[in-house]
């Protein structure tokens, strides 16, 4: 038997730096053709808002031209915006949701 120590003398600890995912805003863009009731129903369905919350978002977009609907990770924001926009397109409305990075 030999007295050889096979254990390393130094303890190397790898520090893994985990960054938080970048967040993106989903934005409702106002148009003059999509019925308000339909916008509210999409907001309730896709973004799980109450009737009051959805109505406030819809009215803000109507008055200001745009309104932030919510803030999500990039993938979730893009998916929700696409699904909500597609819901309008399926009914023949120009309903538009966009995304942009949160600053």
UniProtKB/Swiss-Prot annotation:
Tell me any Pfam family this protein matches: ClpS
Report the domain of life of the source organism.
Bacteria
Q: Which InterPro entries match?
A: ClpS, ClpS_core, Ribosomal_bL12_C/ClpS-like
GO:BP terms for this protein? protein catabolic process; proteolysis
* SUPFAM superfamilies in the cross-refs: ClpS-like
**Role description:** Involved in the modulation of the specificity of the ClpAP-mediated ATP-dependent protein degradation.
Show the PANTHER family listed in the entry.
ATP-DEPENDENT CLP PROTEASE ADAPTER PROTEIN CLPS, ATP-DEPENDENT CLP PROTEASE ADAPTER PROTEIN CLPS1, CHLOROPLASTIC
Q: What NCBIfam families does its record include?
A: PRK13019.1-4
**Annotated HAMAP family:** ClpS
Q: Would you identify the family this protein belongs to, as annotated?
A: Belongs to the ClpS family.
Q: How does it assemble?
A: Binds to the N-terminal domain of the chaperone ClpA.
Instruction: Give the protein's recorded name.
Output: ATP-dependent Clp protease adapter protein ClpS 1
Q: Which organism does this record belong to? A: Rhodopseudomonas palustris (strain ATCC BAA-98 / CGA009)
Q: What is the lineage of its organism?
A: Bacteria, Pseudomonadati, Pseudomonadota, Alphaproteobacteria, Hyphomicrobiales
């Amino acid at each position: 038997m030999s007295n050889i120590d096979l254990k390393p003398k130094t303890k190397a600890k790898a520090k893994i730096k985990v960054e938080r995912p970048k967040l993106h805003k989903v934005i409702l863009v106002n148009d003059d053709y999509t019925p308000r009731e339909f916008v509210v129903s999409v907001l309730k369905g896709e973004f799980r808002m109450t009737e009051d919350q959805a109505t406030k978002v819809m009215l803000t977009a109507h008055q200001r031209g745009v309104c932030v609907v919510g803030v999500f990770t990039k993938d979730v924001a893009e998916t929700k915006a696409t699904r909500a926009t597609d819901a309008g397109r399926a009914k023949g409305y120009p309903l538009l949701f966009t995304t942009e990075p949160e600053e």
